[in-house]
Amino acid sequence: MPKRKSPENAEGKDGAKLTKQEPTRRSARLSAKPVPPKPEPKPRKTSAKKEPGTKINRAAKGKKEEKQEAGKEGTAPSANGDTKAEEVLSTNASH
């Protein structure tokens, strides 16, 4: 493959093509351009002050009560997912 001719050795119509800038490597092109400044982030608006945590506490209390009720009934599985021994005995006796 022939090497590119330098603009000094250009003759005739080839000289017009070589008047353009030679392509450079990508890293050289990117480093030549100044980095545009990043716009500063706008401060987020804070909502009106309410009693802190009232909504969270209500939800947490409701969930705790549901878990306690389910535990009282004896239908909820234990923490590790195993069934209780009483449930196993009752299912085997019915068969």
From Swiss-Prot:
Composition bias type Basic and acidic residues, residue spans: 1-25, 39-53, 62-72
GO molecular function: chromatin binding; nucleosomal DNA binding
PANTHER family named in the record: HIGH MOBILITY GROUP NUCLEOSOME-BINDING DOMAIN-CONTAINING PROTEIN 3, NONHISTONE CHROMOSOMAL PROTEIN HMG
Encoding gene per record: Hmgn3
One cellular component (GO) term of this entry: nucleus
Annotated organism of origin: Rattus norvegicus (Rat)
Pfam families: HMG14_17
Keywords assigned: Chromatin regulator, DNA-binding, Nucleus, Phosphoprotein
Role this protein plays: Binds to nucleosomes, regulating chromatin structure and consequently, chromatin-dependent processes such as transcription, DNA replication and DNA repair. Affects both insulin and glucagon levels and modulates the expression of pancreatic genes involved in insulin secretion. Regulates the expression of the glucose transporter SLC2A2 by binding specifically to its promoter region and recruiting PDX1 and additional transcription factors.
SMART domains assigned to the protein according to its UniProt record, in alphabetical order: HMG17
Subcellular location: Nucleus
GO biological process terms, semicolon-separated: chromatin organization; positive regulation of transcription by RNA polymerase II; regulation of insulin secretion involved in cellular response to glucose stimulus; regulation of transcription by RNA polymerase II; transcription by RNA polymerase II
Record region (Disordered): 1-95
Name listed for the protein in its UniProt record: High mobility group nucleosome-binding domain-containing protein 3
Modified residue annotations for Phosphoserine: S6, S78
Keyword Transcription on entry: no
Principal place of residence: nucleus
Subunit note: Interacts with the ligand binding domain of the thyroid receptor (TR) (in vitro). Requires the presence of thyroid hormone for its interaction. Interacts with transcriptional regulator SEHBP. Interacts with nucleosomes.
Family: Belongs to the HMGN family.
